[in-house]
Swiss-Prot record:
Known function: Converts the aldose L-fucose into the corresponding ketose L-fuculose.
Subunit structure: Homohexamer.
Family named by the database record: Belongs to the L-fucose isomerase family.
GO biological process terms held by the UniProt record: D-arabinose catabolic process; L-fucose catabolic process
InterPro entries per UniProt: Fuc/Ara_isomerase_C, Fuc_iso_dom3_sf, Fuc_isomerase_C, Fucose_iso_dom1_sf, Fucose_iso_N1, Fucose_isomerase, Fucose_isomerase_dom2_sf, Fucose_isomerase_N/cen_sf
Chief location bin: cytoplasm
GO MF entries: arabinose isomerase activity; L-fucose isomerase activity; manganese ion binding
Active-site residues from the entry: 337 (proton acceptor), 361 (proton acceptor)
Pfam families in UniProt: Fucose_iso_C, Fucose_iso_N1, Fucose_iso_N2
A GO term from the CC aspect: cytoplasm
Subcellular location: Cytoplasm
Protein name per its UniProtKB record: L-fucose isomerase
Binding site for Mn(2+): 337, 361, 528
Length: 591
């Protein structure tokens, strides 16, 4: 089967069409702007899969309808998923703009005095607003000389933010969410909303009963040689934590081996269902070898699977990580309990950063007073105002231990193409695999247990659906916190100590939901959240605006908020603008 190509970025150099002196004097400068933009994007960006980003430049500068149509024909044939229009001069507004209604688009008008690039920018944006096709404005803060070919830092920041978000939009379009199972324990996010995926994300939902997973395991619809490799890898790398079950529920060595084997098989089969596996065609399973074209998935597990079979904790943790028995590789996006809305937040974070995502329960707010009462320890530093305990048995990527290192030697999570095998091994070494608690998981299983290193910047996100309003996005930037070991142990043992933990301190603003840490917890819209490495809330805001998903809660600096120019016409308060604009324009892929 032909491999689906990755979306490309289209660069549209537009120009004043008046011949006999005007156009001719601008051709080189305009095309050089396009080439410089393409060079910046290809140098600084990668797809989430690690592949290089490609830019497609119009064959000619665009002065009017004919050249705009020729450019569109070229872009359509090369899978261009977003466009950036560039110009140093006046051009003919509505005659030269990108009219595709679902393709993210930005316009960079050069800030110079010799030619009015800013005037074209304003005219073109007015046309976009009047036609109901929002576009992003890029205009440098400082005037440049006409022969200055550099890209100013503020322009570069907007170009990259737009491109990252636009590539995420284009990469999700046409893919599917694999809903493996149904509703888990009444969790609303696992009531998978097909209309949300179709209308806002341009995706389909592939609903598959969990019996399909059982069939693949029982009928050996998998690569048996790979299973042996996976078992050998686990034997070499897994450290096992204590079994906290009562004696009558503890498994012997043979039973434990069977649980491990099935857990690894679940990872293999879920992966194969998502992306396909040509090895299955070799054993006569051609249909199954194709997969479901899934860019994200969720596994119900509880309770209709886990009351009888091993839980999904091991499978989900391995799939979400940037490595397995095949070495370092692209992480998958798999939501525990089939929480599709948390899965979408994971997908957004992965597409924007290329990194693995940490799925967690937003479990407990610990005030400084409560911690001092229980442990005798007085919180300070990043944790001085209190912390949130993020913990879940399921699909927290092992990268979340933060045993990888950045260029300064600080703990972090990196995109897989920057991760060394030594760093992957360090994440495994920091993880214990604890037998599942029988009262919750009667079929057994293993939960990963690690503790996230402190001082690491994170962005916590969540998508919720509100009846009558639609999807909304929550964002909380903050840091992981490291507690003294005895303090961590006391707090952790008050809950399920066999699960991975991140102690999270959101950045406070003193206003609204970020008045204090308690308010962050109290305003969180569901029981789950996602941690994405870095303070990348601004990228999430830009992406959400492209999809027409309003942001109901964030602590990103106002100067970093970047949305289409038309949002400014929807009122004077920028968050109210967001709601009104999203309601006005409706879902990106209206249905």
């Amino acid at each position: 089967m032909k491999k689906i190509s990755l979306p490309k970025i289209g660069i549209r150099p537009v120009i004043d069409g008046r011949r006999m002196g005007v156009r001719e004097s601008l051709e080189e400068q305009t095309m050089n702007m396009a080439k410089a933009t393409a060079a910046l994007l290809t140098e600084k960006l990668r797809h989430a899969c690690g592949a290089a980003v490609e830019c497609v430049i119009s064959d000619t500068c665009i002065a009017g309808m004919a050249e705009a149509a020729a450019c569109e024909e070229k872009f359509s044939s090369q899978n261009v998923g977003l466009t950036i229009t560039v110009t140093p001069c006046w051009c003919y507004g509505s005659e030269t703009i990108d009219m595709d209604p679902t393709r993210p688009k930005a316009i960079w008008g050069f800030n110079g005095t010799e030619r009015p690039g800013a005037v074209y920018l304003a005219a073109a944006l007015a046309a976009h607003s009047q036609k109901g096709i929002p576009a992003f404005s890029i205009y440098g803060h400082d005037v440049q000389d006409a022969d200055d070919t550099s890209i100013p830092a503020d322009v570069e920041e907007k170009l990259l933010r737009f491109a990252r978000a636009g590539l995420a939009v284009a990469s999700m379009k046409g893919k599917s969410y694999l809903s493996l199972g149904g509703v888990s324990m009444g969790i609303a996010g696992s009531i998978v909303d097909h209309n949300f995926f179709e209308s806002w994300l341009g995706m389909k939902v592939q609903a598959v009963d969990m019996t399909e997973l059982r069939r693949r395991i029982d009928q050996k619809i998998y690569d048996e040689a790979e299973l042996e490799m996976a078992l050998a890898w686990a034997d070499k790398n897994f450290r096992y934590g204590e079994d906290e079950n009562n004696k009558q529920y503890q498994r012997n060595a043979e039973q434990s081996r069977a649980v491990l084997r099935e857990s690894l098989l679940m990872a293999m089969c879920i992966r194969d269902m998502m992306q396909g596996n040509s090895k299955l065609a070799d054993i006569g399973r051609v249909e199954e070898s194709l997969g479901y074209n899934a860019i994200a998935a969720g596994f119900q597990g509880q309770r209709h699977w886990t009351d009888q079979y091993p839980n999904g904790d091991t499978a989900e943790a391995i799939l979400n990580s940037s490595f397995d028995w095949n070495g370092v590789r692209k992480p998958f996006v798999v939501a525990t309990e089939n929480d599709s809305l948390n899965g979408v937040a994971m997908l957004m974070g992965h597409q924007l950063t290329g990194t693995a995502q940490v799925f967690a329960d937003v479990r407990t707010y610990w005030s400084p007073e409560a911690i001092e009462r229980v442990t005798g320890h007085k919180l300070d530093g990043l944790a001085e105002h209190g912390i949130i305990h993020l913990i879940n048995s399921g699909s927290a990527a092992l990268d979340g231990s933060c045993k990888q290192r950045d260029s300064e030697g600080k703990p972090t999570m990196k995109p897989h193409w920057e991760i060394s095998q030594q760093e992957a091994d360090a994440c495994l070494a920091a993880t214990e695999w604890c037998p599942a608690i029988h009262e919750y998981f009667r079929g057994g299983g293993y939960s990963s247990r690690f503790l996230t290193e402190g001082g690491v910047p994170f962005t916590m996100t969540r998508v919720n659906i509100i009846k009558g309003l639609g999807p909304v996005l929550q964002i909380a930037e903050g840091w992981s916190v490291e507690l003294p070991k005895d303090v961590h142990d006391i707090l952790n043992k008050r809950t399920n100590s066999t699960w991975p933990t991140t102690w999270f301190a959101p950045r406070l603003t003193g206003k609204g939901p970020f008045t204090d840490v308690y308010s962050v917890m109290a305003n969180w819209g569901a029981n789950h959240g996602v941690l994405t490495i870095g303070h990348v809330g601004a990228d999430f805001i830009t992406l959400a605006s492209m999809l027409r998903i309003p942001v109901c809660m964030h602590n990103v600096e106002e100067t970093k908020v970047y949305r289409p120019s038309a949002w400014a016409a929807h009122g004077m308060d920028i968050e109210g603008q967001d709601y009104r604009a999203c309601q006005n324009y409706g879902p990106l892929y209206k249905r």
